[in-house]
From Swiss-Prot:
<dbReference type="InterPro" id="IPR003824">
    <property type="entry name" value="UppP"/>
</dbReference>
<keyword id="KW-0472">Membrane</keyword>
<protein>
    <recommendedName>
        <fullName>Undecaprenyl-diphosphatase</fullName>
        <ecNumber>3.6.1.27</ecNumber>
    </recommendedName>
</protein>
<dbReference type="GO" id="GO:0046677">
    <property type="term" value="P:response to antibiotic"/>
</dbReference>
<feature type="transmembrane region" description="Helical">
    <location>
        <begin position="92"/>
        <end position="112"/>
    </location>
</feature>
<keyword id="KW-0046">Antibiotic resistance</keyword>
<feature type="transmembrane region" description="Helical">
    <location>
        <begin position="166"/>
        <end position="186"/>
    </location>
</feature>
<dbReference type="GO" id="GO:0005886">
    <property type="term" value="C:plasma membrane"/>
</dbReference>
<keyword id="KW-1133">Transmembrane helix</keyword>
<dbReference type="GO" id="GO:0009252">
    <property type="term" value="P:peptidoglycan biosynthetic process"/>
</dbReference>
<dbReference type="GO" id="GO:0071555">
    <property type="term" value="P:cell wall organization"/>
</dbReference>
<comment type="function">
    <text>Catalyzes the dephosphorylation of undecaprenyl diphosphate (UPP). Confers resistance to bacitracin.</text>
</comment>
<feature type="transmembrane region" description="Helical">
    <location>
        <begin position="191"/>
        <end position="211"/>
    </location>
</feature>
<keyword id="KW-0133">Cell shape</keyword>
<comment type="similarity">
    <text>Belongs to the UppP family.</text>
</comment>
<keyword id="KW-0378">Hydrolase</keyword>
<dbReference type="GO" id="GO:0050380">
    <property type="term" value="F:undecaprenyl-diphosphatase activity"/>
</dbReference>
Length: 237
């Protein structure tokens, strides 16, 4: 079970298909109880993979005070919302009832990137307003079925940022949110150490695939898969 959870978490955390949605669906299919805290523990494995994968870019980015301040602004919406509605969010992980809706939202967002022209805005020059807007987008990824990487990268592409910068900023945004949730999950979850390890290994592969799809402008292709999972979750829900 830990092997399966870890692999699914690693692959779906960075591919824009929602890891939390997949884990909620798997929990329903296997009749197991997987809550938001246990999911957060799995995130710690993928957190290590993103730090290693993008280490040089992260190190360069964090030399800029503007980027650091923007990251703080981007983190606030999800952090505040997660604390205020902690119990309600956790309840969403106990049932697949809303998965068809949330997976469909992810599919729609990804599909729109196909018709969004490429931009030239750089992460180093991001305004506080843009940082806040992408932070608001990220808070919706607290709902299982809405992809964090999908909604943050897509939002930045819609705001005319370069694909590379959208990807890099999405990576940076994930660190404080995932770290905070993971630490909380360590206290309340009961996932063994094997699951995060498998999540780390499969996460590295997923990061490579995501990077190639964003750079080639083909992230929208994942919308078909999200639509398929939306239909599947409706049929089994």
């Amino acid at each position: 079970m830990d092997l399966l959870l870890g692999i699914i978490q690693g692959l779906t955390e960075f591919l824009p298909v929602s890891s939390s949605g997949h884990l909620t669906l798997l929990s329903h299919l296997l009749k197991t109880d997987l809550n938001a805290y246990q999911t957060a523990v799995l995130h710690l494995g993928t957190l290590v993979s993103v730090v290693l994968f993008a280490f040089d870019g992260i190190r360069r980015s964090l030399r800029s005070w503007r980027i650091i301040l923007n990251l703080i602004v981007s983190t606030i919406p999800a952090g505040v919302f997660g604390v205020l509605f902690e119990k309600q969010i956790d309840q969403l992980f106990s049932s697949p009832r809303f998965l068809p809706l949330f997976f469909s939202v992810t599919a729609l967002i990804l599909m729109f990137t196909r018709y969004s022209s490429s931009g030239e805005k750089r992460m180093e020059n991001m305004s506080f307003l843009d940082a806040l807007l992408v932070g608001i987008a990220q808070l919706f990824a607290l709902f299982p079925g809405i992809s964090r990487s999908g909604i943050t990268v897509s939002s930045l592409l819609f705001m005319k940022y370069r694909g590379e910068d959208a990807l890099q900023y999405s990576f940076l945004m994930s660190i404080p949110v995932v770290l905070g949730a993971g630490i909380l999950g360590l206290e309340k979850g009961n996932i063994t150490i094997l699951a995060p390890i498998f999540a780390f290994l499969s996460g590295l592969f997923a990061l490579y695939v995501l990077s190639r799809s964003v750079r080639s402008g083909k992230i929208w292709q994942f919308s078909y898969y999200c639509l398929f999972v939306a239909i599947l979750s409706y049929l089994v829900g």
